[in-house]
Amino acid sequence: MTALDIIIMAAGKGTRMKSRIPKVLQRLAGRPLLHHVLGQAASLQARRVVVVTGHGATEVEAACAGLAGAGGTFDLKFVRQEPQLGTGHAVQQATPALAGDGTVVVLSGDVPLTQAATLRALVEAGAGERLALLTVRLPNPTGYGRIVRGEGGTVQRIVEHKDANDAERAIDEVYSGIMAVPAQRLAGWLARLTNDNAQGEYYLTDIVSMAVADGVPVAAHCIGDALQVAGVNSPAQLAELERAHQRAQAAALMEQGVRLADPARFDLRDDARSGARGEILCAQDVEIDVGCIFTGRVELGEGARIGAYCHISNATIAAGAVVHPFTHIDGEKAGAHVGEGALIGPFARLRPGAQLGREVHIGNFVEVKNSTLADGAKANHLAYLGDASVGERVNYGAGSITANYDGANKHRTVIEADVHIGSNCVLVAPVTIGAGGTVGGGSTITKDTPPGGLSVARGRQVSIANWKRPAKQAKG
């Protein structure tokens, strides 16, 4: 493959999105559209990528900071198109930043689903000497530039929809907005562009007729999958591509043997907070019920079962673990781990730094954050464990909490092995509960407790016989 530079068109306003966010920063699978296209550039091992910005340029450029070479080795540059005078004008702004040799591929920043294999085939069709166009046949080509062919089926020109006559509008083969151009020819063709058309713009597509006039072969690489070249101009189109993308990811998982209760109700997304790409690694016999969302990098061990409507981010679920419905596991940057055979939920919440051992039970409305629970520990109802180290076989009662924050600093609670914590207890950190000990229900523990003992810290019960409740006073 010849040396490759890429221009990405990202100057459009996206008026139909009705959003303050620039169109190319709208998210698909948790990642901005433009990031998907930059990923395509990385897959082609591009030498240099030039992003043409316009509306929201500052935001777009900031959103791409640090992405140069992500998954590849390209040099990332930005140029601004002000004002926006058409696609040809946009490429004119970018060419000074290119090396001037090899092949230049032009991509659209709002076309996120083009496959790397498709782009490689397009580049090969151009071979550094021909002008290669990526085309597709559409049942309703309204709004797209038509591919006009001459005798023998050779491409003669592209005519934009607004400039097309009735015969040309009947053509169903359309230009996708993606092309591969011999770099040494590009500057000369751009210099000959005019804006003598219905839009009063400089069309990049006019270089096709110039190539024909100059005797440069024009190749059309026509694909059958229109979703690969579908752009985003409205929330409805974004939703359509989101579902197409998620269906493809679901299909790939099922090919690996994962049981999805309903592939139409499965989502895998990037994590914008940690920067982790959406990736799910599944062992054999994994089952995922409906409505689950996976964010960032998630590993599911052999026989793991995920109940309906769970949200799992940056976490590892070990073999045989069961996550019951409506559970939220969010490892964020610190990660979260659920051990083999553990039972989680329903309605449980594991936060960053939650590390659960084998056969741990975390029940409904229990929250665990930055805490380690050793094998066999249980917190089955309505409890909070934050900044805690919990030993083996601990039973942590309903309504109990670790008071880990003093208003300025976090402190740890240590609960040693075989401890029984009664219901509605408060463990005020820093504090250690000795091995085998018991804390009586309703206690507020502020000091370390000895191993094997019973610790009770609560007001003494007082019962008053024959006590009369206050009576309501008569009104008026």
UniProtKB/Swiss-Prot annotation:
Annotated region described as Linker, given as residue ranges: 236-256
Q: Which InterPro entries match?
A: Bifunctional_GlmU, GlmU-like, GlmU_C_LbH, Hexapep, MobA-like_NTP_Trfase, Nucleotide-diphossugar_trans, Trimer_LpxA-like_sf
Q: Which GO terms describe its biological process?
A: cell morphogenesis; cell wall organization; lipid A biosynthetic process; peptidoglycan biosynthetic process; regulation of cell shape; UDP-N-acetylglucosamine biosynthetic process
* Principal subcellular localisation of the protein: cytoplasm
Region (N-acetyltransferase) location:
257-476
Q: Give the Enzyme Commission number.
A: 2.7.7.23, 2.3.1.157
Q: What class of enzyme is it?
A: transferase
The answer to keyword Isomerase applying to this record is: no
Q: Which residues are noted in the entry as acetyl-CoA-binding?
A: 398, 404-405, 423, 441, 458
Q: Where is the active site?
A: 381 (proton acceptor)
Q: Which GO terms describe its cellular component?
A: cytoplasm; membrane
| General function of this protein | Catalyzes the last two sequential reactions in the de novo biosynthetic pathway for UDP-N-acetylglucosamine (UDP-GlcNAc). The C-terminal domain catalyzes the transfer of acetyl group from acetyl coenzyme A to glucosamine-1-phosphate (GlcN-1-P) to produce N-acetylglucosamine-1-phosphate (GlcNAc-1-P), which is converted into UDP-GlcNAc by the transfer of uridine 5-monophosphate (from uridine 5-triphosphate), a reaction catalyzed by the N-terminal domain.
Q: Name the family the entry cites.
A: In the N-terminal section; belongs to the N-acetylglucosamine-1-phosphate uridyltransferase family.
The protein depicted here goes by the name Bifunctional protein GlmU
Source organism lineage?
Answer: Bacteria, Pseudomonadati, Pseudomonadota, Betaproteobacteria, Burkholderiales
